[in-house]
């Protein structure tokens, strides 16, 4: 099952005014005043929606992919390249061939942080059982329009997946302190219609997040601070029916599996449930 998401629609909307409005297009990049190389910064931290996920950039290790869209006499020119995060202040530098301004017209930028570093690689989301494995699923994006020549835009990244937070709080089975429950819950699972995500380049030259693979159960990460609490990241989708499974055990009794049913719910990217 494949679910095509609309992550790139925001930038497409940004491009429409550039292509439809009357703009005095300036050609002749060789005569541009100042630096032709696109310069940019990133926010202080990638706004991951998972507490066990990525909470800060790692200078010298992390890099982002930038798509740069600018109107020219022949239409919208798309160029792309990678930028390394070079310091804790969010400074960046081109990784390889730099992205260049073609003229002085306002432009649009769409950027991705892909945890594997390989933009052609698919991400398997089935095992998020540790903080490290949650961070391996963090897929972030940022968009900005009407970027003026000679400025240094700041990109604010947000998550492209939805965050699921499971809290087991059956008050009828807890003692006075919920940290010492009468019934222990473990082996949490969360159902997803798609078990992998990838980036695909569209005909517009922009990248879109695509969810695919078989449906199945995700192993979430236990919260490090709250007992009987788990979290995981899933692609945007609709889910109904048995969505959560827990293994429950009271004392020395035989453990049993309990399923939690939910009404049809639309899980949106960047939100917490």
Q: What do these predicted regions represent?
A:
Residues 2-5, 18-273:
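Sec-type signal peptide cleavage vicinity
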């Amino acid at each position: 099952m494949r679910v095509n998401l609309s992550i790139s629609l925001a930038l497409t909307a940004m491009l429409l005014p550039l292509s439809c409005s009357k703009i005095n297009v300036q050609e002749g990049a060789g005569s541009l005043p100042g630096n032709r190389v696109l310069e940019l910064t990133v926010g202080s931290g990638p706004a991951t929606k998972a507490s066990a996920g990525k909470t800060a950039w790692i200078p010298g290790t992390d890099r982002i992919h930038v798509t740069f869209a600018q109107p020219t006499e022949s239409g919208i020119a798309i160029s792309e390249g990678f930028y390394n995060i070079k310091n804790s202040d969010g400074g960046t530098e081109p990784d390889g061939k730099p992205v260049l301004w073609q003229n002085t017209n306002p432009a649009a930028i769409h950027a991705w942080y892909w945890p594997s570093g390989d933009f052609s690689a698919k991400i398997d989301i089935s095992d998020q059982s540790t903080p490290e494995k949650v961070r391996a699923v963090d897929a972030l994006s940022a968009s900005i329009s009407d970027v003026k020549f000679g400025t240094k835009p700041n990109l604010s990244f947000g998550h492209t997946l939805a965050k699921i937070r499971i809290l087991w709080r059956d008050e009828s089975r807890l003692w006075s302190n919920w940290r010492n429950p009468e019934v222990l819950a473990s082996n949490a699972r969360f159902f997803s219609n798609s078990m992998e995500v990838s980036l695909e380049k569209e005909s517009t030259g922009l990248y879109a997040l695509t969810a695919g693979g078989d449906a199945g159960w995700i192993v979430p990460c236990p919260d490090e601070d709250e007992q009987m609490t788990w979290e995981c990241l899933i692609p945007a989708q609709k889910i109904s029916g048995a969505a959560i499974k827990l293994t429950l055990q009271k004392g020395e009794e035989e453990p049993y599996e309990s399923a939690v049913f939910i009404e049809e719910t639309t899980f949106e990217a960047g939100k917490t449930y």
